């Protein structure tokens, strides 16, 4: 896997608790992890003198690839026609280090009732596969401008549903920011994930846009 958010968060958290384990590599309160996708900046987060989490900066610029038909998404999550919104963006392959198909659903009920159809995922992987990755899907619903509710399914990678997917949340935050016409702005999103499987997580994503280009993408997870 070229990049994954939470392993970076966890490794950054643990190493920040024991900086003596990495002499010479811990300076100015930042670490740099070298990974297949590129260099990942990891910034420890503190409450007083206690490490409570990590911020990580996505290794790649946000990119969008091909679109995927609504019907394929509907089959994968066993929902009805009309459940997928395309007014902002059609279902699209996007990423900041690891690619996912990202699709917006009409309401919270559709999000909550989505069920992973592994056969449909296998069919989608045959028809709409991208790169060397299996077909993985993030669906989301906009609660409001800042609170986003999401679910991630990756059954072909052995994960029927993931409780927290930093790489997908980073891509989602960048996708949402790219839909805004402001040339210069900073966007902050709170992405709620894992609630339907009893493992709720909150991933904070911030994106800086300058001259209509996404310049910086950071996501933060508190361990405690």
Go through each PLM region and give its residues.
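Active-site proximal loop and beta-alpha junction motif in alpha/beta enzyme cores
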Residues: 1-4, 9-224
């Amino acid at each position: 896997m070229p990049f994954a958010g939470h392993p970076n968060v966890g490794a950054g958290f643990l190493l920040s608790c024991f900086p003596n384990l990495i002499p010479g590599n811990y300076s100015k309160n930042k670490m740099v992890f070298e990974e297949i996708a590129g260099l990942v900046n990891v910034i420890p987060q503190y409450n007083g003198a206690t490490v409570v989490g990590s911020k990580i900066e996505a290794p790649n610029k946000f990119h969008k690839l091909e679109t995927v038909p609504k019907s394929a998404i509907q089959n994968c999550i066993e929902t009805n026609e009309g459940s997928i919104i395309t007014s902002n963006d059609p279902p699209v392959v996007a990423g900041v280090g690891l690619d996912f198909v990202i699709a917006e659903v009409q309401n919270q009920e559709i999000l909550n009732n989505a069920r992973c159809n592994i056969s449909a995922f296998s069919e989608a992987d045959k028809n709409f596969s991208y790169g060397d990755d299996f077909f993985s899907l993030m669906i989301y619903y906009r609660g409001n401008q800042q609170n986003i509710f999401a679910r991630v399914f990756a059954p072909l990678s052995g994960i029927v549903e993931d409780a927290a997917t930093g790489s997908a949340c980073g891509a989602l935050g960048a996708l949402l920011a790219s839909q805004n016409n402001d040339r210069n702005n900073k966007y902050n999103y709170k992405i709620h994930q894992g609630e339907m499987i009893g493992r709720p997580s909150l991933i904070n994503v911030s994106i800086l846009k300058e001259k209509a280009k996404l310049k910086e993408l950071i996501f933060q997870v508190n361990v405690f």
